[in-house]
Amino acid sequence: MPPGPWESCFWVGGLLLWLSVGSSGDAPPTPQPNCADFQSANLFEGTDLKVQFLLFVPSNPSCGQLVEGSSDLQNSGFNATLGTKLIIHGFRVLGTKPSWIDKFIRTLLLATNANVIAVDWIYGSTGVYFSAVKNVIKLSLEISLFLNKLLVLGVSESSIHIIGVSLGAHVGGMVGQLFGGQLGQITGLDPAGPEYTRASVEERLDAGDALFVEAIHTDTDNLGIRIPVGHVDYFVNGGQDQPGCPTFFYAGYSYLICDHMRAVHLYISALENSCPLMAFPCASYKAFLAGRCLDCFNPFLLSCPRIGLVEQGGVKIEPLPKEVKVYLLTTSSAPYCMHHSLVEFHLKELRNKDTNIEVTFLSSNVTSSSKITIPKQQRYGKGIIAHATPQCQINQVKFKFQSSNRVWKKDRTTIIGKFCTALLPVNDREKMVCLPEPVNLQASVTVSRDLNLACV
């Protein structure tokens, strides 16, 4: 395929990275004696594939052991009775070791007693994106040969969990396909979009590639794939424009990569923290924000999926549905966790125009806001508000009836209504808690009410 706009984009990304971090920053940590590290390539000699498999074990999480053949594995700390996590990085513009990989490995080993194997294909993933794409099939074959060596040692297919980042997610999918979809799990962290959005299921990550396939989407409008590719597909904050990421090109390389890499940091955070990153199935992000998807009954029979090392993502039904889009909101920084609440406002009298009400939750100087729109000639409206603190710690709610009149004309319109809320998932109306007194609102005037909710 001839070079296109995506190739130019990645060359620009490489230049920006060199300008921003290439000539400064801390030196990489010095490997311990007898410990192996990732290879280093550059823009001009990193296109030919050369693969290393680095084993990390719970007893020495910072020391990578180079394991190529069966004898290396037998003489290493590899334990065939434990689960095996295989991490596959994606395209590397400058041929450098991924900045997130060391923390990812340490966090995995702290979170679970397993063998962690990092697949180093720095040589083969560097330079031009399309060259890296061409290496995917060959890399997948090399990884499958390596996994066959693990099976000979007594490892079961179902105990293997591949975690692929960006382009590495599709590598994982192809490896899973070579094993007939019998590997235990594949997690795709913002699977790459360029060259894969319109690819066949045989060429990209797909729900048939493992017993359970999940994908976390954070950059669907740029470097990530925009279509569902697993049994469960998390579209975080709608799958794009992550909070805390730069919104202007002037931010340089961070502008290009922040949304894309948020999936990695979310997953690491889910391993480190107990606060669940829970998501809810819905037809669209807009419908989710409008409060139309309040539980996980359809299709998960009330078991809401969660990001992290949870069996089948917490989904407890068989057979697993495929390509289910689920949505959640997050904060701008770790631990990213947000609680989701339904908010409703019931008008006492119908109106001949749309009614817009801003609702704000307050607790310990932390605020979270959402807007409720009540269509004309309808009695009530609803929406979703996300808050970092548990709902029972929210002690006040503020309302602002937003005027639709001209700025220079004072609007004295008043409305009266009832406010109710409930923490998601909402499986029945009995969970709703309403303010004991009606709320009187005048246009553009903020009104506060105490909110007393019990902890459960």
UniProtKB/Swiss-Prot annotation:
Glycans are attached at residue 365. InterPro entries: AB_hydrolase_fold (IPR029058), Lipase (IPR013818), Lipase_LIPH (IPR016272), Lipase_N (IPR033906), TAG_lipase (IPR000734). Gene3D superfamilies: alpha/beta hydrolase. The keyword Secreted applies. Disulfide bonds join 245-258, 282-293, 296-304. It catalyses: a 1,2-diacyl-sn-glycero-3-phospho-L-serine + H2O = a 2-acyl-sn-glycero-3-phospho-L-serine + a fatty acid + H(+); 1,2-di-(9Z)-octadecenoyl-sn-glycero-3-phospho-L-serine + H2O = 2-(9Z-octadecenoyl)-sn-glycero-3-phospho-L-serine + (9Z)-octadecenoate + H(+); 1-hexadecanoyl-2-(5Z,8Z,11Z,14Z-eicosatetraenoyl)-sn-glycero-3-phospho-L-serine + H2O = 2-(5Z,8Z,11Z,14Z)-eicosatetraenoyl-sn-glycero-3-phospho-L-serine + hexadecanoate + H(+); a 1-acyl-sn-glycero-3-phospho-L-serine + H2O = sn-glycero-3-phospho-L-serine + a fatty acid + H(+). One of its GO terms (molecular function) is phospholipase A1 activity. The active site is at 166 (nucleophile), 190 (charge relay system), 260 (charge relay system). The keyword Lipid metabolism applies. Residues 1-25 form the signal peptide. It is found in: Secreted. GO terms for cellular component: acrosomal membrane; extracellular space. One of its GO terms (biological process) is lipid catabolic process. CDD domains: Pancreat_lipase_like (cd00707). It is an enzyme of class 3 (hydrolase). Its EC number is 3.1.1.111. Keywords: Disulfide bond, Glycoprotein, Hydrolase, Lipid degradation, Lipid metabolism, Secreted, Signal. Hydrolyzes the ester bond of the acyl group attached at the sn-1 position of phosphatidylserines (phospholipase A1 activity) and 1-acyl-2-lysophosphatidylserines (lysophospholipase activity) in the pathway of phosphatidylserines acyl chain remodeling. Cleaves phosphatidylserines exposed on the outer leaflet of the plasma membrane of apoptotic cells producing 2-acyl-1-lysophosphatidylserines, which in turn enhance mast cell activation and histamine production. Belongs to the AB hydrolase superfamily. Lipase family. This is Phospholipase A1 member A.
